[in-house]
A protein has these predicted regions:
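Soluble regions of membrane-associated proteins that transit the secretory/organelle pathway
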Residues: 2-7, 31
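Short, isolated positions in well-ordered beta-strands
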Residues: 12, 86-88, 101, 337, ...
Length: 386
């Protein structure tokens, strides 16, 4: 799925667009025990509650593609004959009316997801009459292209509110508000099947994870029967480690600055092009980039080999997972420097009197702890004002 396809399905989760007739739910306590289950018809809910329910579900299709939204492919063998794929198909094809399939799915999630507190599992089914899209991009609402039938799973923490004072308007007084339990933003979930090329793709699901640093290995293994992808934050850390270890003494400030600048440039160009397909690079692409930066060929080769070992051969990585586009950071054991990436080229390293230094040009407006300071030349005497 690309960004346009995700946005198209996300827009379905509105009261005037959705064909969702009911939502299945399972409330689980901190002991992994089912507290309650429900099958809630949306038509019986007040409009505000219906919109809140759809809003919670919609968030499962939010975030950045490749970071929060990750494609989970199924092998041909899984699609032909596997318990995990058969269960997902049963949920979809029955429109969540297969009680045994719903029960088995809830049990799978509970056995594989163990947060500290209570949580809510939501299942929704929607049937989308996909409108025809002409070659010029215009959508013809009255001309259907195909029917897309899918299920969306959302897992949300349920948290207790804190005691607070509330204002009672009729009595014109303040009282303690009762402690309550509220449904928080989704922690993880998935869409099945994927909406690839604007049609159902039973060979793929779109997995959602709110945190870019979390990896719910057991959940992914239970639901998709596959290895969990490396979280975005771990990709960034691993990429930096590979860069430093493989280049060794060739990993200079200039090289890191250039790599950061070029990756950020690729991200900006992709954003400006409005290409819906995700931007990716491979270890081979990075090897070419490093060679262009002046890195010796054998070290660039070592980098490519390390990428294949850590990420997989010919793995397609999102540059957004590898660099911070809004900051450029330098750390020593004692000092931390953060610079707007636009001005990172101002920083340089130099040996002075045999000691290594990090140099930053100081213009006007220098402050220390909020106090503006003056930087004087050592060969110029300070003159007192009369």
């Amino acid at each position: 799925m690309n960004e346009k396809e995700i946005s198209e399905i996300r827009r379905r989760f509105r009261a005037d667009k959705s064909n969702i007739t009911h939502v299945r739910g399972c409330y689980v306590n901190e002991k992994q025990e089912i507290v309650s289950q429900f099958d809630q018809p949306l038509s019986l809910l007040p409009q505000e509650e219906c919109e809140n329910m759809l809003s919670v579900l919609r968030r499962t299709l939010s975030g950045t593609l490749g970071k929060n939204l990750i494609e989970m492919p199924f092998t041909t063998a899984q699609v032909v004959d596997s318990d995990e794929h058969r269960l997902l198909m049963a949920l979809r094809d029955s429109k969540l009316t297969d009680e045994e399939a719903v029960r088995m799915f809830f049990e799978k999630v509970i056995a594989s997801y163990r947060p500290e507190g209570t949580y809510l599992i939501l299942l929704a089914n929607d049937t989308y009459d996909v409108p025809y899209r002409a070659k010029d991009g215009e959508t013809l609402e009255d001309a259907s292209e195909n029917i897309y039938n899918y299920v969306l799973c959302t897992v949300c923490p349920v948290k207790q509110t804190k005691p607070v004072l509330g204002y009672d308007v009729p009595e014109n007084t303040f009282h303690n508000r009762d402690i309550d339990w509220i449904v928080s933003a989704p922690q993880l979930g998935f869409l099945f099947p994927s909406f690839t090329d604007r049609s159902a793709d039973i060979y793929s699901a779109m997995y959602y994870c709110r945190s870019a640093s979390e990896s719910y290995d057991e959940f992914i293994d239970a639901v998709f029967n596959r290895e969990a992808p490396m979280p975005a934050e771990e990709q960034k850390t691993t990429f930096g480690t590979i860069l430093g270890d493989s280049l060794n003494d060739a990993c200079s400030l200039d090289v890191v600055q250039t790599v950061h600048s070029r990756l950020c440039g690729m991200i900006e160009e992709h954003k400006a092009s409005k290409d819906p397909e995700p931007l990716t690079i491979t270890g081979r692409t990075m090897k070419t980039m490093l060679t262009a930066c002046g890195v010796p060929g054998e070290k660039a080769e070592k980098f490519e080999e390390a990428c294949a070992e850590q990420f997989g051969a010919d793995a397609a990585l999102s540059p957004r997972n590898l660099v911070e586009t809004k900051k450029f950071e330098i750390k020593t054991p004692e000092v931390q420097i953060r610079v707007d990436p636009e001005y990172s080229e101002w920083i340089e390293t130099r040996y002075i009197d045999g000691a290594p230094y990090i140099l930053i040009p100081a213009g006007a407006g220098v402050q220390v702890n909020g106090v503006p300071i003056a930087i004087t030349r050592p060969d110029v005497e300070y003159e007192e004002e009369e």
